């Protein structure tokens, strides 16, 4: 049901309830009606929408719920505005009100899609509000792995979905460029620069073994210049003894590589925030001092502890170890203070499920500061791991990273790049990257975040209905082909279709397809409210299925203009919604396949 129709029907039902309540209790009686909730019945035979308001009000009004439902329906159907919207109403079970919409109400979605085009499904209900969405936030110690890819897909699609409701969305990447891992990166690069490789005597135990380290060392020795998208260029000095210069070069090199990974994946950020800046600007010390002054800490065994149990944690946590270094959640607290100070009252973090333990600590630290941050800030979406399969076997390593599969590997393999071709990226064309990006983005968003995901490369390469992204894209391409044929055979352009006689669309398949189109706006609202971007992929697969059912049941290109143009109008509206949904996922909508 279209949102406008839903709002109208809710208002009509609320007015009907008020009329009945006044008739039963008197116009002056105190009465608070519950909010009207409309749901689509699970069984199509039960109508298009169902409402349980009679069951909610029977006791307060002192009447039988089924009799009350009959009175509400009588009041509803007597209203002129309802007569063009509701075709039939019936009472089911103990008092459910089941309504069947008129054919015109169902067909109205086609005109709405034509009128709104790419904006169909979007809303401005949250206009003026802003959201900070933090995702990926990888250490700059190697290429992005498939877990980062899942975060990138979840974050980018969720940002699109939230923006569709009118929010101004700020995409942020938090670089963990301070700590032990960065030191390990520096000594790894230094060892490679000295001619060592994994397994050699003198190779550091904590070093990274991927071939990308050798690439960094080579460019450092050659005096190459590298730059991340938001930073100053850094030139390799070639000095193998200058560990600080090596560290700066290696971090910038890998930030540039991660930028390239994200570019290949079609993901852009509004801001990159460096963990190191929290230290250089004194924000970590300031946060710790504020918690000490607030009485949220205590000293024990030479360490500084945070009273996280005050906020529901199972035990208190160390903030500053006996050696004077901070535990990893302390800069996270300082970082989230900056989010609050920048005016972001709604913040969503997308992280791996292994970060679950840090949630209570960060929230406890923020509450302990007593600066007005609400409980439950920030929101979190936690995702589980991704397993990559190829030829029936799990893929655990790649030439790029040595110990894990990278996002770029996954994109190139899913686009059809041959095994080993990733070592020669110049041989991989843009079409391969586009196919791969589409497959990876769609696949990684096609399951709920809190479920483990098996990414099957062989399935991503299939060009049949088993491959969900192919299935949806093929529906779009097939409609484009039909509309092109409509133009060439009958000289009917898509621009003429809004004038079609939609009363021709009465079949069960046409009705089901129109109802699915009308669900798109509510689906987006639900996905935004529940932080559930997978709902878009679920919807698109269902919509493609409804299209195929309709197309297989009814011929579109017939000589009789009335049914032909009506069916073509339905296809054109379906094509637009498929395009809109694919754009929400950051996936292309090809006109030919």
Swiss-Prot record:
Keywords: Aminoacyl-tRNA synthetase, ATP-binding, Cytoplasm, Ligase, Nucleotide-binding, Protein biosynthesis. The keyword Nucleotidyltransferase does not apply. It is an enzyme of class 6 (ligase). A motif ('HIGH' region) lies at residues 138-148. CDD domains: ArgRS_core. One of its GO terms (molecular function) is arginine-tRNA ligase activity. Its EC number is 6.1.1.19. Signal peptide: none annotated. It catalyses: tRNA(Arg) + L-arginine + ATP = L-arginyl-tRNA(Arg) + AMP + diphosphate. It is found in: Cytoplasm. The keyword Aminoacyl-tRNA synthetase applies. InterPro entries: aa-tRNA-synth_I_CS, Arg-tRNA-ligase, Arg-tRNA-synth_N, Arg-tRNA-synth_N_sf, ArgRS_core, DALR_anticod-bd, Rossmann-like_a/b/a_fold, tRNAsynth_Ia_anticodon-bd. It comes from the Bacteria. GO terms for biological process: arginyl-tRNA aminoacylation. One of its GO terms (cellular component) is cytoplasm. Its main location: cytoplasm. Monomer. Belongs to the class-I aminoacyl-tRNA synthetase family. This is Arginine--tRNA ligase. It comes from Burkholderia cenocepacia (strain ATCC BAA-245 / DSM 16553 / LMG 16656 / NCTC 13227 / J2315 / CF5610) (Burkholderia cepacia (strain J2315)). The lineage of its organism: Bacteria, Pseudomonadati, Pseudomonadota, Betaproteobacteria, Burkholderiales. The gene is argS.
């Amino acid at each position: 049901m279209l949102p406008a129709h839903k709002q109208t029907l809710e208002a009509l039902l609320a007015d009907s309830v008020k009329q009945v309540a006044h008739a039963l209790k008197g116009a002056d009686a105190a009465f608070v009606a519950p909010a009207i909730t409309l749901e689509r019945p699970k069984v199509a035979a039960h109508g298009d929408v169902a409402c349980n308001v009679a069951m909610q009000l029977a006791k307060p009004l002192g009447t039988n719920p089924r009799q009350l439902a009959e009175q509400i329906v009588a009041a509803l159907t007597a209203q002129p505005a309802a007569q063009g919207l509701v075709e039939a109403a019936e009472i089911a079970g103990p008092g459910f009100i089941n309504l069947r919409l008129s054919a015109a109400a169902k067909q109205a979605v086609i005109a709405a899609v034509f009128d709104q085009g790419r904006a169909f499904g979007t809303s401005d209900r949250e206009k003026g509000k802003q959201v900070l969405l933090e995702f990926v936030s990888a250490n700059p110690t190697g290429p992005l792995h498939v877990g980062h890819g899942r975060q990138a897909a979840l974050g980018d699609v969720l940002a699109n979905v939230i923006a569709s409701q009118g929010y101004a969305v700020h995409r942020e990447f938090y670089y963990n460029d301070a700590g032990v891992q960065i030191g390990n990166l520096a000594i790894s690069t230094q060892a490679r620069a000295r001619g060592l490789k994994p397994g050699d005597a003198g190779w550091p135990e904590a070093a990274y073994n991927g071939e990308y380290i050798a690439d960094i060392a080579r460019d450092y020795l050659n005096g190459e210049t590298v730059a991340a998208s938001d930073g100053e260029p850094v030139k390799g000095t070639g000095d193998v003894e200058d560990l600080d210069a090596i560290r700066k070069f290696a971090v910038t090199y890998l930030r540039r590589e991660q930028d390239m990974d994200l570019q290949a994946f079609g993901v852009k950020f509004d801001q990159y925030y460096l963990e190191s800046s929290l230290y250089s600007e004194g924000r970590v010390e300031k946060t710790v001092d504020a918690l000490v002054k607030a009485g949220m800490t205590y000293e024990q065994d030479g360490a500084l502890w945070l009273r996280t149990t005050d906020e529901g944690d199972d035990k208190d946590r160390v903030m500053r170890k006996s050696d004077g270094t901070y535990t990893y959640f302390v800069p996270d607290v300082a970082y989230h203070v900056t989010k609050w100070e920048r005016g972001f009252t709604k913040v969503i973090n997308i992280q791996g499920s292994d970060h679950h333990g840090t949630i209570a600590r960060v929230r406890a630290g923020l509450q302990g500061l007593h600066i007005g941050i609400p409980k439950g800030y920030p929101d979190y979406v936690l995702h589980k791991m991704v397993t990559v399969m190829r030829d029936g076997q799990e893929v655990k390593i790649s030439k790029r990273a040595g110990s894990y599969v990278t996002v770029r590997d996954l994109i190139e393999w899913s686009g059809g790049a041959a095994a080993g071709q990733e070592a020669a990226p110049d041989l991989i064309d843009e079409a391969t990257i586009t196919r791969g990006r589409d497959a990876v983005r769609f696949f990684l968003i096609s399951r709920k975040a809190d479920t483990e995901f098996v990414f099957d490369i062989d399935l991503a390469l299939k060009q049949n209905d088993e491959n969900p992204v192919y299935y949806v894209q093929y529906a779009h391409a097939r409609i484009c082909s039909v509309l092109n044929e409509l133009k060439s055979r009958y000289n009917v352009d898509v621009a003429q279709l809004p004038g079609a006689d939609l009363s021709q669309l009465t079949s069960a398949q046409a009705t089901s397809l129109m109802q699915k189109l009308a669900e798109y706006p509510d689906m987006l609202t639900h996905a935004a409210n529940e932080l559930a971007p997978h709902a878009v992929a679920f919807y698109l697969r269902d919509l493609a299925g409804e299209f195929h059912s309709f197309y297989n049941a009814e011929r579109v290109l017939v000589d009789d203009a009335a049914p032909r143009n009506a069916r073509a109008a339905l296809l054109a509206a379906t094509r637009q919604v498929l395009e809109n949904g694919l754009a929400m996922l950051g996936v292309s909508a090809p006109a030919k396949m």
